[in-house]
Regions:
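Alpha-helical transmembrane segments and their membrane-interface exit regions
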Residues: 231-242
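Transmembrane helix-bundle signature of multi-pass membrane transporters/permeases
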Residues: 229-233, 262-266
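Membrane-helix and juxtamembrane interface regions of eukaryotic multi-pass membrane proteins
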Residues: 1-220, 246-265, 271-366
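Hydrophobic alpha-helical membrane segments of integral membrane proteins
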Residues: 200, 223-231
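Intrinsically disordered, low-complexity regions enriched in proline, serine, glycine
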Residues: 224-227, 239-240, 275-276, 320
Length: 366
């Protein structure tokens, strides 16, 4: 019986052997979907529901009440970080892998087939396309939580009563999704057949993103982490939009508007450092000095690294642009010189034979 290739990879003419690497890669979305469905089905049975709910539901609620006759509306639940969260992170990591394959199969692959991109630009297109979807989703989800919790209208909520900062349902779900997404980047290196020379930067991105968010989530910095992540994703959205523009804009007609990316990056980095100093140095430090200073130093080191990487990349791009411009000028000069010589020869060929300048061979014979 023929096996239909799964989502997320291009289908091949031959069906690979079952349980081979190629089979797993081609059908990884279907395999992961089956694993996820096991937890969903187990949730429907009373005997397995407690086990399955540990992976699907959010736990460690500290306040809240279910609706009752005395209180028909109940009370909203609030949550804290706990060990059971890693079960939920595992399940939502499976969900992220499935969504990654769906976006790749039904959006990015269909668009890339019409563009006829080179391998390098195709890699950039797929990477930026996937990240933009995640960043846009995270930005709007984070902004929604910020507005609901009133962190903009009352900025002091970021440090008041620290570390007693219980989270709402959406606030906790935001962090579970963040941790799951950065964790799913590691198996995607295998599923997407990423070359070894391209894996290092992606592994660093995955591990650093997961570690930073996990530390903020575990040590009760969920409020400031929510604000800073939402702000960071705004800059990442603009950055990857311009990266996609670079893929589509083959003639570099829109190169002049790339300063918007630079302005956004500077704004995000400056706003991040200001919010970090106000919250950690002037707010949290009044409650727990050591934890606040450690978080502030870590935040500043991270911002310094991002600024250094940005400046290095801009200098490299500037050098490449100058080198390409110089090569273009040299090519234009050669073409202009060749055109002048051709025009001169054509002009001489139109003259009578007696008026034409003798060729070097004829002059030597004389």
């Amino acid at each position: 019986m023929a096996i239909k290739p799964g989502m997320g990879r291009k289908s091949s003419s031959k069906n690979p052997p079952i349980f081979s690497h190629e089979f797993v890669i081609q059908n990884h979305a279907d395999i992961i979907s089956c694993v996820a469905m096991v937890f969903v089905v187990a949730l429907m049975d009373e005997s397995t529901s407690p086990f399955a709910s540990a992976f699907i539901s959010l736990h460690h609620n500290v306040t809240g009440e279910e609706p009752s006759r005395e209180n028909p509306h109940g009370k909203p639940f609030s949550y804290v970080a706990g060990i059971k969260d890693y079960c939920a992170i595992f399940f939502y990591t499976l969900t992220c892998i499935i969504m990654h394959a769906i976006i790749q199969e039904y959006v990015l692959d269909k668009v890339s087939k019409r563009l006829h991109l080179s391998k390098f630009k195709l890699s950039l297109f797929n990477e930026s396309g996937q990240l933009i979807v995640f960043y846009v989703f995270s930005f709007f989800m984070g902004a929604n939580v910020i507005l609901r919790e009133g962190y903009l209208s009352k900025f002091s909520l970021l440090w008041e009563q620290f570390p007693n900062h219980p989270m709402s349902f959406l606030h906790k779900l935001f962090f579970i999704i963040q941790l799951a997404y950065y964790l799913h980047m590691l198996p995607e290196l295998y599923f997407q057949k990423v070359k070894k020379e391209d894996q290092q930067s992606k592994i660093i991105h995955s591990i650093c993103g997961f570690s930073v968010i996990c530390l903020a989530y575990t040590f009760s910095f969920q409020r400031i982490a929510l604000v800073l992540l939402t702000l960071h994703y705004l800059g990442e959205i603009v950055s990857h939009v311009f990266q996609l523009i670079g893929v589509f804009d083959r003639d570099e007609k829109l190169a002049s508007v790339r300063f918007v990316n630079n302005v956004t990056f500077v704004f995000v980095r400056f706003a991040t450092m200001v919010i970090g100093v106000l919250t950690l140095y002037y707010g949290v430090a009044t409650e727990t000095v050591l934890r606040a200073y450690a978080a502030l130093v870590g935040l500043m080191v991270l911002q310094g690294y991002l600024i250094y990487s940005f400046i290095t990349e801009e200098l490299r791009a500037t050098r490449e642009a100058k080198r390409e411009a110089k090569q273009h000028q040299q090519q234009q000069a050669k073409k202009s010189k060749a055109a002048k010589e051709k025009a001169k020869k054509k002009k001489e060929s139109d003259l009578p034979e007696a008026d034409q300048s003798p060729s070097p061979a004829k002059a030597k014979a004389k």
